[in-house]
Each structure stands twice: as structure tokens, then as C-alpha cells.
Amino acid sequence: MSVTDVSGLSQLGTKVDTPESPEKAVLEKVPNGNAGTDYVVRFTAPEFTSLCPMTGQPDFAHIVIDYIPGDFLVESKSLKLFLQSFRNHGAFHEDCSVYIAKRLVELLQPKWLRIGAYWYPRGGIPIDVFWQTGAAPEGVWLPDQGVAPYRGRG
């Protein structure tokens, strides 16, 4: 087992305020101690919040991010703060979902990444957004994201 070098991180182990916006949020990475081995990392944010850009009302989603790392892993505290930065950010569901994925791809250059964003209904219609970088490498176990389709009270 190896210890990861965290010397270059600016947020881990310190008190950090929630960033003002996703654009100002600092995503950080750490070396992947298992580079060269294909495996899936999953982050789940069941209480993701952003704002409707038209009404300013809150929007809620259950977000699942799966990725197969290359040389780097996302540092989880920086990811948490990045996701929290959407709380006061107005954007459509699709824009939030794809922006999250593209920021992670830009930072990590993973072998593969997908996001499933399961948005709770607004105007009676749930919106689910799915995006991925391409086909996953063969032979990697990709579990279902485990989020049932929205059924309301039915």
C-alpha cells in the first residue's frame, strides 16, 4: 500500500468556504497509486442543488459520477466544494450536468468518465441527463448507477 503525496493540495486539511461559483471553484487532483490498473471510482451526490436560471428557485438532483482514472484521482474535498458551489448558481439542468463532467475530464484526463444526473421534477417533469466520454475500456465492471426512474407517489 502506498501513501499519496498531498503536499500540493490547498484545501485538504484546512477550513475552506464554499466557492462563490463553479467557475471559481478549485478542483484538485492527487496521483493515482494504481495507475495502469483499470478500475471504477464512483462519487454520488444525492442532494445536489443549483438554481433555476429563470425563476431563481432551487433545483435538486441525485448525481452519480463514475470514472476510470489514468494517472490522477480527484481529491474528494475539492469535489465536494465544487459541487456545493452550484447552490447559488443559476443554470439549466443539462448545463450543470455536462459542465461538472467536462471540468473533471479537463482536470484528470481519465481513461473514461460518465455522469448520470437525475433531476427532480420541475413543472411536473423530471429531467435526467447522461453524458460520457465514449466507450468504456473492455473488461471493466461498470455497475448500474442504481437510481430508479422517478415515479412520484405512484
Curated annotation (Swiss-Prot):
Residues 17-27 have a biased composition (Basic and acidic residues). Pathway: tRNA modification; tRNA-queuosine biosynthesis. Substrate binds at residues 74-76, 93-94. Keywords: Cytoplasm, NADP, Oxidoreductase, Queuosine biosynthesis. Coiled coil: none annotated. The active site is at residues 52, 59. Its EC number is 1.7.1.13. It catalyses: 7-aminomethyl-7-carbaguanine + 2 NADP(+) = 7-cyano-7-deazaguanine + 2 NADPH + 3 H(+). GO terms for cellular component: cytoplasm. It comes from the Bacteria. Residues 1-13 have a biased composition (Polar residues). It is an enzyme of class 1 (oxidoreductase). Residues 1-30 are annotated as: Disordered. One of its GO terms (molecular function) is preQ1 synthase activity. InterPro entries: GTP-CH-I_C/QueF, NADPH_dep_7-cyano-7-deazaG_red, QueF, QueF_type1. The keyword Cytoplasm applies. The keyword Oxidoreductase applies. It is found in: Cytoplasm. One of its GO terms (biological process) is queuosine biosynthetic process. Pfam families: QueF (PF14489). Catalyzes the NADPH-dependent reduction of 7-cyano-7-deazaguanine (preQ0) to 7-aminomethyl-7-deazaguanine (preQ1). Belongs to the GTP cyclohydrolase I family. QueF type 1 subfamily. This is NADPH-dependent 7-cyano-7-deazaguanine reductase. It comes from Agrobacterium fabrum (strain C58 / ATCC 33970). The gene is queF.
